[in-house]
Amino acid sequence: MNEELQNQFMALDVYNQQVQKLQEELSNIDMMIMELLRSIESMEGLKSSKEILLPLGAGAFIKAEAQNPEKIILSVGVDVLLEKDVDEVIVDFQKSVKELEETKELVNTQIQKTNQEIVKLRSELEKRAAAIEQRNAQMRPKTN
């Protein structure tokens, strides 16, 4: 196999790895969006009921009542907490969801472009393989 052909096979492998990483990134983005949407839903729920489920760990919860549901305490860094109004946090989370959706679109576009390159490269490799096969067939001695 000549060097150019080897390079094309390596490029194909790299493209496939890129698509896989981008798909993993999409999955992570989806999980972040879902977490933000659940948080927004929970904060909206605090407006009608102060009752919350407090996680204890290992899938166990206890019913509790929020003392001050108008304020949310956010972790903004290592050992740094910030208190904000619930409506302000909801708006911030909605902005984050929108930004993540935009990022998701960019990642999907990149996946499409990379897949187009994969299709193009595979087509080239198939043509070359067919040409090599034809050349080899012509070089074989014919038997009667």
Swiss-Prot record:
Chief site of localization: cytoplasm
InterPro entries (UniProt xref): PFD_alpha_archaea, Prefoldin, Prefoldin_subunit_alpha
Name of the protein: Prefoldin subunit alpha
Family membership noted in the UniProt record: Belongs to the prefoldin alpha subunit family.
UniProt cross-references to Gene3D superfamilies, sorted A to Z: 1.10.287.370
GO biological process terms on file: protein folding
Subunit structure: Heterohexamer of two alpha and four beta subunits.
The entry's keywords: Chaperone, Cytoplasm
Subcellular location: Cytoplasm
Function field: Molecular chaperone capable of stabilizing a range of proteins. Seems to fulfill an ATP-independent, HSP70-like function in archaeal de novo protein folding.
